[in-house]
């Protein structure tokens, strides 16, 4: 009977979880504290001043603050790369019989944001065929170099396709429809071929970035699923992206057909430092017998276990999340005051370590409860903490280790966002190519590099650049070395010459 009740309780918890995923709030943020359970860290109430205070009975409207770059009264902001088309509005006074009595002394400017439909341009290179009058010899200038030999695609359209597919998540079949509507006839297979060839050109850059990232003292690593290739008719294989985040704000997406430890061993071969992860067992197996690697644990994943137990053990789960919440308040203070190095370490030791010690003591006391069954979500959360105490404390002794892997999880969002549009990869090669291009585009975002300008440059530069110096083409290095004088497409050069 007890077993039946336990099974029934677990099924109810699973049903509640599915309802939450479908209809409920997915964020772990607590919108408001439950007033029936006072905070563990309530500050003392301030002593009321005995001096009588004046009561203000009117309200003063606060003036609206505008950003420095605000150029119009509506708040429209743009930089110098945005084209501006000027439309002259004639003054009626200058059109009539008395026009000679008026003169223009100034202009009032009104600006409105407008949009042209997505457009494509065919570049026609006209090369004269020259004949020598005496010898009758014919000659002509060579065609400009293209990204692909004898290719029909300008670098601008290749970069645009990659940006549309992997930044804005527009599948190629929709891009193909847009081409047709613009009057361009190309097969979808051609677009796929162009995409694959362009990514293959970029692969050495992504590989070089992985080697740079592995030089970091602290790495963050996670995994996320992707369907790639057919397991059987009507069913796709489950494969995995394993992103690795380095200390210089660079991320590398690696891919594996499995979620086993072997991939971690392969990708992190030779790494020495601290590895920040969630509680997945593959990472524990990886660091076993590796004294040169320290495993650190993510506090956000720890909090998630208690969040899942809220409906079953509301009061205890709330208390646990209050403990962890105080750690995050300390991290906010560190960030606001821009603490680094020893100052950051001292602050964590003084303010966060006592909270961690108190939290572990609280967890121990909760585990002594005789009414807490092993199947209870709170029991699982407490066991999780007990099994990872050492890893959860690593960030207290190393200022370069973050409290969680949220910075990595934010970069991961491009994968589920892409899945909602292109659903899966047809084959495993396609999954590897997604990993390659997302490595570069996501790092562009982290480095505040315009991804379109970056791709236009490196797709032209990669075949001319020395292979031994390919690391210079990674987004972080490219920003310092080439961004100021990046290569343009022929279309962009035409646009500049017209102005």
Report each predicted region and the residues it spans.
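Short helix/loop capping segments that flank catalytic or ligand/cofactor-binding pockets
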Residues: 103-105, 140-142, 228-230, 252-254, ...
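Active-site-adjacent "gating/activation" loops or surface patches in catalytic cores
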Residues: 119-173, 242-251, 415
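Short, flexible loop/hinge motifs at secondary-structure junctions
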Residues: 1-152, 191-192, 220-221, 227, ...
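Acidic/histidine-rich catalytic cores and adjacent linkers
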Residues: 280-282, 319-499
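Gly/Pro-rich turn-and-neighbor structural signature
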Residues: 75, 83-98, 173-266, 270, ...
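Conserved beta-strand -> loop -> alpha-helix junction used to position metal-binding or nucleic-acid-contacting
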Residues: 218, 274, 287-322
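Mobile genetic element proteins and their domesticated derivatives, centered on retroelements
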Residues: 24, 93-95, 132, 161, ...
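Conserved catalytic alpha/beta cores of large enzymes that bind or transform nucleotide phosphates
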Residues: 157, 162-164, 176, 304-344
């Amino acid at each position: 009977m007890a077993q039946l009740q336990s099974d029934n309780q677990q099924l109810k918890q699973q049903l509640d979880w599915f309802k939450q995923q479908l209809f409920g709030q997915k964020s772990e943020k607590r919108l408001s504290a439950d007033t029936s359970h006072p905070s563990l860290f309530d500050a003392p109430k301030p002593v009321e001043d005995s001096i009588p205070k004046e009561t203000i009975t009117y309200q003063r409207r606060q003036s609206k603050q505008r950003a420095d770059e605000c150029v119009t009264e509506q708040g429209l902001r743009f930089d110098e790369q945005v084209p501006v088309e000027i439309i002259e509005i004639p003054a009626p006074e200058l059109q009539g019989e008395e026009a000679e009595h008026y003169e223009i002394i100034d202009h009032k400017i009104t600006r409105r944001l407008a949009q042209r439909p997505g457009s494509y341009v065919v570049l026609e290179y006209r090369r004269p065929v020259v004949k020598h009058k005496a010898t009758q010899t014919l000659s002509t200038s060579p065609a400009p170099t293209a990204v692909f030999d004898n290719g029909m695609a300008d670098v601008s359209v290749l970069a645009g396709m990659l940006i549309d597919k992997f930044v804005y998540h527009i599948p190629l079949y929709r891009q193909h429809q847009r081409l047709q509507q613009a009057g361009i006839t190309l097969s979808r297979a051609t677009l796929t071929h162009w995409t694959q060839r362009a990514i293959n050109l970029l692969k050495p850059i992504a590989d070089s970035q992985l080697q740079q990232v592995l030089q970091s003292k602290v790495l963050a690593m996670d995994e996320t699923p992707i369907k790639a290739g057919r397991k059987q008719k009507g069913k796709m294989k489950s494969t995995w992206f394993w992103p690795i985040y380095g200390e210089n704000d660079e991320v590398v997406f690696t891919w594996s057909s499995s979620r086993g430890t072997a991939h971690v061993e392969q990708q992190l071969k030779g790494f020495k430092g601290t590895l920040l992860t969630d509680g997945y067992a593959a990472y524990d197996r990886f660091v076993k017998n590796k004294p040169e690697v320290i495993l650190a644990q993510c506090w956000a994943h720890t909090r998630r276990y208690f969040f899942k137990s809220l409906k079953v053990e509301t009061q205890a789960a709330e208390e646990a999340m209050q403990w962890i919440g105080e750690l995050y308040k300390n991290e906010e203070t560190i960030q606001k005051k821009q603490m680094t190095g020893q100052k950051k370490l001292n602050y964590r030791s003084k303010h966060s370590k006592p909270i961690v010690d108190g939290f572990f003591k609280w967890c121990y006391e909760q585990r002594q409860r005789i009414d807490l069954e092993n199947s209870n979500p709170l029991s699982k959360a407490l066991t999780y903490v007990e099994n990872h105490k050492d890893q959860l404390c690593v960030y207290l002794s190393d200022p370069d280790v973050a409290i969680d892997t949220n910075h990595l999880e934010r970069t991961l969002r491009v994968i589920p966002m892409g899945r909602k549009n292109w659903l899966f990869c047809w084959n495993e090669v396609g999954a590897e190519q997604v990993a390659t291009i997302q490595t570069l585009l996501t790092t562009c975002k982290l480095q505040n590099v315009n991804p379109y300008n970056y791709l236009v440059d490196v797709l032209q530069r990669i075949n001319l650049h020395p292979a031994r110096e390919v690391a210079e083409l990674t987004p972080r290095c490219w920003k310092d070395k080439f961004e100021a004088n990046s290569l343009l497409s022929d279309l962009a050069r035409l646009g500049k010459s017209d102005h």
